[in-house]
């Protein structure tokens, strides 16, 4: 039922009840009975203000909409605003990355353009709020031509853990980086000093930029909230001006995709088949995940190099080199574009010229050595021919195996038919040492 509209008479009744001490103990019906003769004796000029007040109240009630809430009691309108702001910020970030790559491409400096990759490890996350307690930080400068030119790595000792979350921090550390918890943690204890050092290192190659331009760093989408929160955590204790240059965290996956498209364009190679899903799938494979010698000494010793931030940022640089340097004919330098020591994930066994390539499965064709691929290229790799070659090469090892050819319907084993025929005894090839028990 729609709510009743206010009228001038009821507005007058409410005012009479508020201003008349006699009316304080009366009910609404009794107050209406008292005010009815007074209202009838009033003229239009006296009733005018009350009618106007009632009209204004009705207009305000219609315009004022009740705020919708979700199941957790949060405002739906505020959630929509936050969602739209996040979408707008992501779109602006992607446009900024594309402008950076386009500017470097137009100035013929694409291979010399430097990017900064950063990563944080953390002890724990606050239950309420986007707050991460930092544990380790690493960064590196990378370009296609020079590879990894320099890197920065440090462990962090914040001095304490969020109250009541020691158990969560212990579980997270045990399953990931295995760094000792504060106050026994390693590294710098002065958060303000550490932030100034990190900021100065990130800004050292940006002299040509204006002071108000932000410092742009790149990390994975999963680590973006961690990196942003850890930078805020360190900056909260640093003595910096509000107008100081800020650190902006961008998506390295979009950089990987945009840079690959531009590299192929510069190399004169068609890039129609390159899309975000292709480049993202290549990046997340993380081919250098278990490479030795690229993490810090602590994680190398305890065999946790996969979770070391120093290893992360270097692996990202190696992935960029592995995917793009060949398109621009850039030679790979060990330690800069690829690890110093690379262990192959396959073993090539020398074979004679009489190697039976028909016994190689179709799945192993693309992982076979180039010599084998070349010789296999002239062969028929259709499923039918492959099946025939495998059947010819197969030699049964079990002497009790059924040796029928199964070429005719009579020899095919019956599956519950009425006329069940047993195969001839000659089809069973029993070994000399085997006898049938009677």
Curated annotation (Swiss-Prot):
Q: Where in the cell is it found?
A: Cytoplasm; Nucleus
**Function text:** Involved both in the piRNA and miRNA metabolic processes. As a component of the meiotic nuage, plays a central role during oogenesis by repressing transposable elements and preventing their mobilization, which is essential for the germline integrity. Repression of transposable elements is mediated via the piRNA metabolic process, which mediates the repression of transposable elements during meiosis by forming complexes composed of piRNAs and Piwi proteins and governs the repression of transposons.
Which intervals of the chain are annotated as region Disordered?
A: 374-438
What the entry lists under InterPro entries is as follows: HMG_box_dom_sf, Maelstrom, Protein_maelstrom
Keywords in alphabetical order, please. Answer: Cytoplasm, Developmental protein, Differentiation, DNA-binding, Meiosis, Nucleus, Oogenesis, Repressor, RNA-mediated gene silencing, Transcription, Transcription regulation
Q: Where is the composition biased (Polar residues)?
A: 381-391
Task: Return the protein name.
Answer: Protein maelstrom 2
The UniProt entry lists the main location of this chain as cytoplasm
Q: Which GO terms describe its biological process?
A: germ-line stem cell population maintenance; male meiotic nuclear division; negative regulation of DNA-templated transcription; oogenesis; piRNA processing; regulation of miRNA-mediated gene silencing; regulatory ncRNA-mediated gene silencing; spermatogenesis
Q: Which cysteines are cross-linked by disulfides?
A: none
Cite the GO molecular-function annotations of the record.
transcription cis-regulatory region binding
User: Which protein family is it in?
Assistant: Belongs to the maelstrom family.
| Known DNA-binding region | 2-69
Q: Gene Ontology cellular component?
A: cytoplasm; nucleus; P granule; perinuclear region of cytoplasm
């Amino acid at each position: 039922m729609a709510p009743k509209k206010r009228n001038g008479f009821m507005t007058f009744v409410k005012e009479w009840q508020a201003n008349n001490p006699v009316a304080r103990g009366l009910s609404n019906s009794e107050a209406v009975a008292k005010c009815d003769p007074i209202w009838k004796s009033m003229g239009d000029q006296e009733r005018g203000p009350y009618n106007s007040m009632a009209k204004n109240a009705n207009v305000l009630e219609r315009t004022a909409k009740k705020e919708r809430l979700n199941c957790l009691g949060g405002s739906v309108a505020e959630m929509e605003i936050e969602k739209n702001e996040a979408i707008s910020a992501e779109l602006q970030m992607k446009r900024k990355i594309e402008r950076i790559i386009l500017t470097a491409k137009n100035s013929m400096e694409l291979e010399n353009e430097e990017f900064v990759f950063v990563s944080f490890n953390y002890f724990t996350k606050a239950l309420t709020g986007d707050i991460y307690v930092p544990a380790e930080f690493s960064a590196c400068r990378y370009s296609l031509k020079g590879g990894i030119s320099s890197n920065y790595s440090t462990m962090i000792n914040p001095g304490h853990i969020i109250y009541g979350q020691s158990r969560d921090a212990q579980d997270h550390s045990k399953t990931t980086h295995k760094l000792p918890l504060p106050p026994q943690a390693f590294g710098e204890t002065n958060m303000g000093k550490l932030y100034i050092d990190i900021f100065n290192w990130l800004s050292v190659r940006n002299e040509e930029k204006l002071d108000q331009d932000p410092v742009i760093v790149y990390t994975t989408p999963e680590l973006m909230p961690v990196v942003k929160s850890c930078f805020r955590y360190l900056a909260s204790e640093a003595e910096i001006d509000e107008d100081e240059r800020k650190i902006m965290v961008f998506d390295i996956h979009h950089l990987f995709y945009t840079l690959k498209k531009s590299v192929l364009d510069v190399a004169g190679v068609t890039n129609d088949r390159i899309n975000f899903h292709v480049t993202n799938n290549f990046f997340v494979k993380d081919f250098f995940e278990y490479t030795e010698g690229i993490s810090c000494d602590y994680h190398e010793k305890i065999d946790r190099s996969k979770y070391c931030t120093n290893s992360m940022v270097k692996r990202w640089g190696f992935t960029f080199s592995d995917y793009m340097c060949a398109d621009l004919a850039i030679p790979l330098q060990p330690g800069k574009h690829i690890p110093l020591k690379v262990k192959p994930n396959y073993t090539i066994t020398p074979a004679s010229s009489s190697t039976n390539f028909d016994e190689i499965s179709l799945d192993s064709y693309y992982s076979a050595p180039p010599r084998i691929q070349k010789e296999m290229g002239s062969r028929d790799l259709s499923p039918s021919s492959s099946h025939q070659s495998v059947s010819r090469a197969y030699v049964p090892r079990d002497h009790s195996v059924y040796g029928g050819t199964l070429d005719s319907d009579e020899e095919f084993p019956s599956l519950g038919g009425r006329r069940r025929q047993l195969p001839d005894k000659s089809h069973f090839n029993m070994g000399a040492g085997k006898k049938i028990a009677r």
